[in-house]
Structures are given as C-alpha cells and as structure tokens.
Amino acid sequence: MNIRVIFISIFLFSQGLIAQELLTPDKAVSLALENNYGIKFVNTQVEIANNNTSILNSGYLPTLTGNAGASFDKQDSEGKLANGETREANGAETRRYNASVNLNYTLFDGLGRMYDYKQLKVRSQLTELQARETIENTILQLFTIYYSVAELEENTNAISQTFAISKDRLTRAQYQFDYGQSTKLASLNAEVDINNDSIALMNSKQQLKNFKRDLNLVLGNTLNEDFDVDTQISFSNLMNKDELLQKTKLYNSALQQLDKNIEINNLIIKSEKSGYLPTVGLTGSYGWNETSNNSPLAFVLQNTSSGFSGGLNLRWDLFDGGSTLTRVKNAKLNSEALNIQKEEFIVTLERDFNNAWDDYQNKLNIFRLQEENIKTSQNNFDRTQEKFKLGQSNSIEFRQAQINLLNAELTRNQAKYDAKISELQLLKISGEILNVKF
C-alpha cells in the first residue's frame, strides 16, 4: 500500500472526528424514550388499556336504542254488510308509521359485571408493567450499543496512537537508511508495520460507523453519524447483595406481571361464579304509532297512539348443562398453574440474580486488574522506546512492546465496558435500571 495514500486516509478520518456532537448517556435515554419505535408502540397499548377502564366500557351504563318504521299497502277489497248490501273498495291505501325509544339496564348480573370491570383495571396495570419491561429492555439494548461505540472510539484512538508511533519509526528508519546508519530491512519492516496499523485503524473506523448506525436506530433515527459518546463511566455502588436480591423479588417486572396475571385469574373465578346467580333487568320504552287508510269499509280512517311502558325481568339459569361449573373448575386449575409458574420463576430469578451478581463482580475485578496491567505495559513500552532511540533495542523488540501496549489498552477497554454492561444487566434483573443515573 502506498504510504502517502495511507497518511491521507488517516488524516481525513482524523478530521472527521473533530468537533462532533457529544451524545451523553442522559441525552441518549431521553431520545430513546421519545423516539424509539418499540416504546412508541407500547405507549399506544397503554393508552388502549387505559381507555378500556373507562366507565363507558364497564357495562354499568344503560343502553338506549331508537327504532322507526313505515309501511304502505294498496289493496282491493269487498265487504258484505248485515243488510245484505255489498260494498267494494278498489285501490284502498293503508299507511302505517311507528317510532320508539327503548331503554335496557341490567340491575344485577350476579356481580359478574363488577369483577369484569376490576379485571379491566388490573389488565391496564399489567399493560403498564409490560410497557415498563419493554422500556427496560430498550434501555439495556441502548447502552449495550452505546458502550460498544464508546469502546470502539477508545480503541480507534489507541490504534491511532500506535499508527502515529509507527509513522515516526518509519521516518527514523528512512533517515537512518539515507545516512547509512541502518539497512533497508529496518525501513521495510517499519513500512509493513505501518501498513498493518493502517488496516487495523480502517477496520476499527468501519466498525465504529456500523455501531453508530445501530445506536441511531435504537434512538429512532434522530441523529446523523457525526457524533461522539461519553467514554467516562462510573460504576454504581452495588455493595449489599442481600438488599438487592430483596429488591429483585419486589420490583422485577416479569415477576410483577406474573402477580398481575394471578390477580386477574382470581377475578375470572369470581366472574364465572356469577353464572350461578340470577340476572335482573329493567326495560322501558316510549312509542308512537299511526295508521291511516282511505277504505270505505274501514270503521276508523286514522288511528294514532303513543305512550310509555316499563318492566322488570328476571332470568335464572337453574341448569345450563354444566358449562358454568366447568368454567369455574378450569379457572381454578389455571390459578394453580399460575402459582406453580410463579414458584418456578422465583427460583429461576434467584439463580439469574446470583449469576449476574457474580458475573458483575468478576468483570469489575478483571477491569481493575487490566488497569494495573496498562501501567506495566506503558512502563515497559516507555523503557523499550527509550532504548530503541538510543540504539540499545532492535525494531523487533520495539514492535513487540508496542503491540503489547496496544493489546493491553484494547483488553482494558473491553473489560471496562463489559463490566458496565454487566452492571446494567444486574440492575435490569433487580428492576432498578430505570432508577439509576446514567
């Protein structure tokens, strides 16, 4: 690869990193909550569930219907009177008109309506918990990608520094060769190393672009690619394992949803039992009717009536073939199944919490060790670089120290963000991820 082309490519890339917008964690969360497609969807579901809890959807209000009708007929008829006289009515027209308003109201339905309405309220709470879980998952996904971008930014900077050192080494090797102080081999080795560093830098640059696009997707495509993320992180003070475990059993969103499902099923049992009781209804209506005809045989040419009517009705299914009994039994069995599911979930949740806690502690310790390893690698590189400049170390030893330092930096960066993501996974399990400052 032409060294001039490499330098131009790296320069252009470096210029692209200057003065870019900083996307802070708080801003990323704000953008995700406002624009993420999944969160928008669940917010709509919450609105629907809230609408379902309205008194208009409760069954407590009466129904009022209006009816109207009209008819027309034209007939030929013949009638014989008592005195033997016969009369005919040809083309006699009859018109009928009617209108009514009808009221129906259920006074008592065995309390089924009450328990159904309570179900709607609990289902609304369940939908809110489902929305919360979606938001928690989105926040975890957001920061998994966010910190991947941060890691790649730090990796790119580290590789850029390595490239700059290799560039300086190549310049030195070329000068030394020009003045007869070294062989052409040293210059060629330096050129090979700078080629490798440039390839690593371009790959890191491409990965960074890809992950920025992934991050932008989670944010609802609200940003362009010219942004940086905050690489300064702090870890939460998660010292008391038992206290956090208790919070997990109280606030884990999936466990809370199971509790709501159990509550809903208990209401279903009560609602199904309402089938054992009678239903009492109230009816009322106001009607108007008019009939007119021009038949000479008719005693009344026009008749109009209007008035109110009302009544009570009672229905009691003394035996419905056993369907109510079957539904009640099945609802009780479903309640047992849900409680078994909850017991299993709690055991699984405790296991997942312990795994997440140990994983977090392990990764946090690895990060701290890698921080110490950086100091050792940096010290080793500084010494080797000084010897190399004095001619007391060869290019192979210098390159190895350079690679060791770069690998230590890349490993430290990975350990740093792995520990942070592990912390967020632990907070997600415990139901605390929305209560911490990012």
Role assignments for model-derived ranges:
Residues 40-44, 57-58, 93, 107-135, ...:
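Sec/SRP-type N-terminal targeting helices
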Residues 177-181, 388-392, 429:
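A short glycine-centered flexible hinge/capping loop motif at secondary-structure junctions
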Residues 20-148, 280, 284, 325:
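Short flexible linkers and secondary-structure junctions
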Residues 67-105, 230-237, 270, 283-316, ...:
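Small/polar, glycine/serine/threonine/aspartate-rich low-complexity segments that form flexible
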Residues 19-69, 181-183, 223-263, 317-318, ...:
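Bacterial Sec-pathway N-terminal export signals of envelope proteins
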Residues 51, 134-249, 359, 363, ...:
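Periplasmic alpha-helical coiled-coil/stalk elements that build and connect Gram-negative outer-membrane
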Residues 1-26, 36, 438:
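Bacterial Sec-dependent N-terminal signal peptides
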Residues 29, 411-438:
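Acidic, low-complexity, intrinsically disordered peripheral segments
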